[in-house]
């Protein structure tokens, strides 16, 4: 049961949280260095 339930929580978490952190860090990097 745990093996079937864990991916159903873990996959959306990685799929949503990781891109959000990547976009946030990228926007902070651009704002600091003023590339745009």
Swiss-Prot record:
Keywords: Chloroplast, Membrane, Photosynthesis, Photosystem I, Plastid, Thylakoid, Transmembrane, Transmembrane helix. It is a single-pass membrane protein. One of its GO terms (cellular component) is chloroplast thylakoid membrane. The chain crosses the membrane at residues 9-29. InterPro entries: PSI_PsaI, PSI_PsaI_sf. The keyword RNA-binding does not apply. GO terms for biological process: photosynthesis. SUPFAM superfamilies: Subunit VIII of photosystem I reaction centre, PsaI (SSF81540). It is found in: Plastid, Chloroplast thylakoid membrane. Pfam families: PSI_8 (PF00796). The keyword Metal-binding does not apply. Belongs to the PsaI family. May help in the organization of the PsaL subunit. NCBIfam families: PS_I_psaI. This is Photosystem I reaction center subunit VIII. The gene is psaI.
